[in-house]
Amino acid sequence: WERIYVTGKGTGSTAYPQMTLSTIVGSGTYYRLGLPAPASLPSTPVLSNKDSSATIPTGAATPSLLIDQESPKSISYVVTYVSTYGEEGPPSQPLLANIVDVYSDQNVTVTFPANPSGYGNIAKKRLYRTDTSGTYRRVKDSNYSAATVLDDLTESELQEALPSSSWEAPPDEVTSGDYGHKDGPMLGLVAMPNGILAGFSGQTICFSEAFLPHAWPRDYQLTAKSDIVALAPMTSGLLVLT
């Protein structure tokens, strides 16, 4: 990948785990490691008829000509951020207000939440929606600057399932909400033989997804009895020094 991942660089508000390109290490831009979950979608998606010339009956509850012919599908939407390097972050929190009943002759316009600050390497927003089984599947990507996106796909046109539901950023005391950590930002970053990175924060040992250094599921964390001071990778595991 030709990237460098570091912890313990910077002070105060810049003490978070970081990454940069190996070709510019020492002189290039460092980015916060991991991506944030977007805020929940700010409003109920807006429905429109696929046929812009369709005459919708006056007083119709929704812009569809199929109300008496089929049952609508209840669809929920979430969005993720994707970095310049193709890394994908966790999804927004789905809300009841984001669920909409859709007929087969309708399109849906989704409004994105406001963009976060402090993440200069986000390039895209990726929209997902539920299929008939309740699985979130990819709809399409939009530019980071986009305010809305049109979902005009049929279910058969949906792409892969959402892979990043647990892909949090590593512990980082600078960020807030689910990504804050009482013991501060992750330190002691090491690479293990199986493609997994490990680090620590206080008494917490953190592990990344294999070969995905930006993804640090909370379910993978372990707790030591004492504060951790260093980690050392071994062929058969990880040595934890307290």
Model-predicted segments: where are they?
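Beta-sheet-dominated scaffold domains
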Residues: E2-R3, G195-I196, K225-T242
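Intrinsically disordered, low-complexity segments enriched in polar/charged residues with Gly/Pro
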Residues: G184, P217-R218, A224-S226, P233
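Active-site-proximal structural scaffolding
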Residues: P72, G120, V190, A224, ...
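Disordered, low-complexity "stalk" and linker segments at domain junctions of extracellular
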Residues: W1-G195, S201-Q203, F207, P213-D219
